[in-house]
From Swiss-Prot:
The gene is CLIPC9. It comes from Anopheles gambiae. CDD domains: Tryp_SPc. Disulfide bonds join C50-C93, C60-C83, C66-C94, C139-C155, C258-C284, C300-C328. InterPro entries: CLIP_Serine_Protease, Peptidase_S1_PA, Peptidase_S1_PA_chymotrypsin, Peptidase_S1A, Trypsin_dom, TRYPSIN_HIS, TRYPSIN_SER. The lineage of its organism: Eukaryota, Metazoa, Ecdysozoa, Arthropoda, Hexapoda. This is CLIP domain-containing serine protease C9. GO terms for molecular function: serine-type endopeptidase activity.
């Protein structure tokens, strides 16, 4: 017969408590995340394709880029393998925000280059359609989900969207605009918070020529040496409106430099629409000076709402929405609405619409 001392019994009781606590933690973790089927290679690099029982043709993405509806779903909580993570950065296999991202190959593009078909599958056109005059295309927009486009708030009013448009009057798909949702802070008399969501009546039919673009969510300016791309159908140096999609390369003008430039410019030539100067919600970029002319590569009226974009990890990311400037091709940087500053509003608005 084994007789335990008081000390031994107390130690045994403590060990039982420890084991119970460990079992409780295991049960909590299991009930929260479920049995995760580990992929063959758990250290998949960001941007690579991945598959899970719930996600076919997904992509390893920063969790903040995932579709919010998916992140809060049972499928995510129970069966989403981690592609890559550390204490500060988590990458999972999911449908990127919003739905999925493309894997890529009235402002006008001054001194731009004609785009090849399907080069910018996220780019859409916005316009007004009437029985008398047909369609008058007035702005550009960016596909961010199967039902939403992102554009400039000053593009309103519009009632039709063209998708997969290679030439001025030829689009693979046309979709009726259900609602035009300007950012609540936007005022028509000013050039601030110039961003809007366009909700379409029907889901977009995705194909190689029609795909969404990922939002660039960092609020830090990209390096001045990195090439950025603008695109649109606006007027060129030789046409009031380009019959074909054009694109051009520009580079970042750092925020402080841009603020100083416009402060001097607005002091000499006051503009009530820019009475606050350049704000942090704006992104500044400028193209090179064109040889033999006194103009810079730039966007002008007709391209409004189009993209300022960068390519990273084989994906195109939307940095800004073409908004305004101080004359086409001028020496002043072009002004773009910084998408990262409105990322929360975009997510909330799209998610709220889905829930209705």
């Amino acid at each position: 017969m084994c007789i335990l001392t008081l000390v031994e019994r107390k130690h045994l009781k403590n060990m039982v408590h420890v084991r119970l606590l460990v079992m409780m933690h295991i049960l909590i973790i299991y009930s929260t995340f479920g049995a995760v089927r580990r992929p063959i290679n758990i250290r998949v690099l960001e941007g690579n394709s991945c598959d899970t029982p719930q996600v076919i043709g997904g992509k390893c993405m920063n969790i903040s880029l995932c579709d919010p509806a998916f992140v809060h779903s049972i499928a995510y909580q129970e069966h989403t393998p981690v592609c890559q993570q550390n204490a500060f950065y988590r990458v999972i296999c999911c449908q990127p925000f919003l739905d999925f991202c493309e894997n890529s190959k009235q402002f006008q593009i001054m001194h731009g280059i004609e785009a090849e078909p399907g080069m910018f599958p996220h780019l859409a056109r916005l316009g007004l359609k009437s029985e008398e005059d047909g369609i008058a295309w007035t702005c550009s927009a960016n596909i961010i989900s199967e039902r939403f486009l992102l554009t400039a708030a000053h593009c309103n009013p519009v009632n039709i969207a063209g998708l997969g448009c290679a030439e001025s009057m030829q689009c693979d798909q046309q979709n009726t605009v259900k609602s035009f949702i300007s950012n609540p802070k936007y005022k028509t008399s000013f050039k601030y918070h110039d961003i809007a969501l366009v909700e379409l009546e029907q889901n977009i039919r995705f194909n190689k020529r029609v795909l969404p673009i990922c939002p660039y969510i960092s609020k830090t300016d990209l390096h001045e040496s990195e090439d950025l791309v603008i695109a649109g159908w606006g007027a060129t140096e030789s046409h009031f409106q380009s019959p074909r999609l054009m694109f051009a390369t520009v580079r970042t003008v750092l925020q402080n430099d841009c603020k100083d430039h416009y402060a001097s410019l607005l002091k000499a030539s006051p503009n009530k629409k820019l009475h606050q100067g350049i704000t942090d919600e704006m992104y500044c970029a400028q193209g090179a000076l064109v040889d033999n002319v006194t103009e810079y590569i730039d966007a002008c009226s007709g391209d409004s709402g189009g993209p300022l974009q960068t390519k990273q990890n084989n994906n195109l990311y939307l940095i800004g929405v073409i908004s305004t400037g101080f004359g086409c091709g001028s020496s002043s940087p072009g002004l773009y609405t910084r998408v990262a500053s409105y990322f929360g509003w975009i997510k909330e608005t799209v998610s709220a619409t889905r829930d209705n």
